[in-house]
Swiss-Prot record:
Catalytic activity entry: D-tagatofuranose 1,6-bisphosphate = D-glyceraldehyde 3-phosphate + dihydroxyacetone phosphate
Gene Ontology molecular function, alphabetical: tagatose-bisphosphate aldolase activity; zinc ion binding
Taxonomic placement: Bacteria, Pseudomonadati, Pseudomonadota, Gammaproteobacteria, Enterobacterales
Cofactor(s) in the UniProt record: Zn(2+)
Annotated protein name in UniProt: D-tagatose-1,6-bisphosphate aldolase subunit GatY
Gene3D superfamilies: Aldolase class I
Protein's gene: gatY
Length: 284
């Protein structure tokens, strides 16, 4: 089996003090880059897609390509549903072979968030599918979801304890000052809050919105309990900037087998850096 649950790899990361990178992908080329690079560095890997990505590329296509790449590189990985909100959608994708899920009910009141997440956990655990949920809200934009900065909410440590106990989730995404998208100024992460959450919660903790974070912040967050680091925007920008630059310099280019090469190379450098920041090279 090359498509696996995220549960075991996150528990190992928690025990050994590193983080597993979750890279958001969009198509064949971005999948190739993250699997190839992780395999070369023997890094654990989570390949993530938002609802928009699965709608664009097709869940069956993503699972099949990921499985074939994992097999060819002899590199097990998790295909992960990022920021999914509907149980019916999750059921369909689990049936298609996904084994790692994030249910996002963070926009609901606390009790409603618990009820939604528990329904997903009850279903997914029957099929050995790991479940991540979010408590608190990150600002910024993910797919079509836009959260204004004033609506972003930090995770409350005591609520985190209750949330984990009542839902039975496998990992918890927390809000400590990161945001989706690129930062216009260097964020100030609430490491004290992270420490307080870690003291109350025994499941692996997840950091969303890591694109553009300084290495020192990522490594400190990992030292305080973060076990999974999500990166999306930074990958897209590296890929698209290199592609645009190549096509600007080679106006006659028409073969995607050629003009995708520099785009993939630029994205690969970001993947290598994130793996280094996570301290997970050789940890497969």
């Amino acid at each position: 089996m090359f498509i696996i649950s995220g549960r075991t790899m996150l528990k190992k990361a928690q025990q050994e003090g590193y983080a597993v990178p979750a890279f958001n992908i969009h198509n064949l080329e971005t999948l190739q880059v993250v699997v190839e690079t992780a395999a070369e560095l023997r890094s654990p890997l989570i390949v993530a897609g938002t609802p928009g990505t699965f709608s664009y590329a097709g869940v069956g296509n993503i699972v099949a390509i990921a499985a074939e790449l994992a097999k060819s590189w002899n590199h097990p990985l998790a295909v992960h549903l990022d920021h999914h909100e509907k149980l019916a959608d999750i059921k369909m994708k689990v049936a298609a072979g996904v084994r790692s899920v994030m249910i996002d009910g963070s926009h609901f009141p606390f009790a409603d968030n618990i009820a939604l997440v528990k329904s997903v956990v009850d279903y997914c655990h029957r099929y050995d599918v790991s479940v991540e949920a979010e408590l608190g809200r990150l600002g910024g934009q993910e797919d079509d979801l836009i959260v204004d900065g004033k609506d972003a909410l930090y995770t409350h440590p005591e609520q985190a304890r209750e949330f984990v106990e009542k839902t039975g989730i496998d990992s918890l995404a927390i809000a400590i000052g990161t945001a989706h998208g690129l930062y216009t100024a260097e964020p100030k992460l609430d490491f004290e809050r992270l420490t307080e959450i870690r003291q109350r919660v025994d499941v692996p903790l997840v950091l969303h919105g890591a694109s553009g974070l300084p290495t020192r912040d990522i490594t400190r967050a990992i030292s305080l309990g973060i076990c999974k680091v999500n990166v999306a925007t930074e990958l897209k920008i590296a890929f698209s900037d290199a592609l645009k630059n190549y096509l600007t310099q080679h106006a006659e280019a028409s073969d995607p087998r050629h003009y995708m090469i520099p785009a993939k190379a630029a994205m690969k450098e970001v993947v290598r850096k994130v793996i280094a920041d996570c301290g997970c090279e050789g940890k497969l």
